[in-house]
């Protein structure tokens, strides 16, 4: 049956998890990667080794499968008393529950909570039997191999899944970009700019393999833009400068401008560019907030970070150029030609156009300097292309959906039989799905 049912695609991020089935255009569920458990006095259990001591699957569903030391053998009512996602956030607002985020900076930190989260995702939300489905999970670049082994132990021993494939998020984001009209060939070589809520990563990928030594992270992402909008509202003394209002303004009105000085002049000449945003406060009272310069100033912190903070001063285009220049020389042309955007903080209007222009200027300046030093030898130039597409927000999930529906996907998965024969270390390596020898 597992050969006929669609694969389950799960992209668990620091902020949000995306769950769904291969072949679909969008995830079935998107909710916070959060879990609410009973306070310690209520006895939530857990093991010091990091392996969970929780029950999730009724014995009549296990068919006797699975060792006695895992979920199916530890059915206590206290182990089932928890919530995930939006329900967890709501439960934590009441008495008796504590809110936890099992993933920090892309890495799973609490395996007990993560197993409970996966269990509810599978049985309560997706409502599938793991024995009948192959699973495609995502991981951040440079994820420790021990994390893969822990994941395999949970999915094979606790959930008894039919097959497991773990893919790097950046590689899946490249696959998601294949839907763009700009992409002529389905290449897994490119530079992925993944900007979510907490951090922005610049990740070079060559033939489906991450160039780990060249990865750079910058401490500017969606949350910083929200804080910046909030500070601008407070400075003006707006009647509502809450974080929620700042986020609404960021998502609804902000865009990237080609030149910040000229944009200020445009606003000063044309007052119609200033907008009004109406908020209904908890008591039912409506207030109006003026929306002005922050429309273009907020996303500008990617390109001129000094307007936000003195802690980090390197513009994103300079970081991207440096990442590619630090990569092996034989793949640099492909990395410049296929710069792929991923994550919610890359969705601003004209973000890709501005990034492409600024990187191109850096490249052209370097080429001209090289031509001068060489005594007049002319360069053939370098193609710089930033790829924007409709699947940017959930790029890794959609890439997993694309690759998970291919006929050969199941042959690339590791199975329960292989896991039992070779042990957890088998998941340290996966054949490259969609790359050389793949689709």
From Swiss-Prot:
Localization of this protein: Cytoplasm, Cytoskeleton
SUPFAM superfamilies for this protein: Actin-like ATPase domain
PROSITE patterns named in the record: ACTINS_ACT_LIKE
Region (Disordered): 40-71
Signal peptide start-end: none
Keywords: Actin-binding, ATP-binding, Cytoplasm, Cytoskeleton, Nucleotide-binding
Keyword Phosphoprotein attached: no
GO cellular component annotations of the record: actin cortical patch; Arp2/3 protein complex; cell cortex of cell tip; cell division site
An example Gene Ontology molecular-function term: ATP binding
Pfam families, per the entry: Actin (PF00022)
Gene Ontology biological process terms from the UniProt entry: actin cortical patch organization; actin filament polymerization; Arp2/3 complex-mediated actin nucleation
Purpose of the protein: Functions as ATP-binding component of the Arp2/3 complex which is involved in regulation of actin polymerization and together with an activating nucleation-promoting factor (NPF) mediates the formation of branched actin networks. Seems to contact the pointed end of the daughter actin filament.
Assembly: Component of the Arp2/3 complex composed.
Record family assignment: Belongs to the actin family. ARP3 subfamily.
Name of the protein described by the UniProt record: Actin-related protein 3
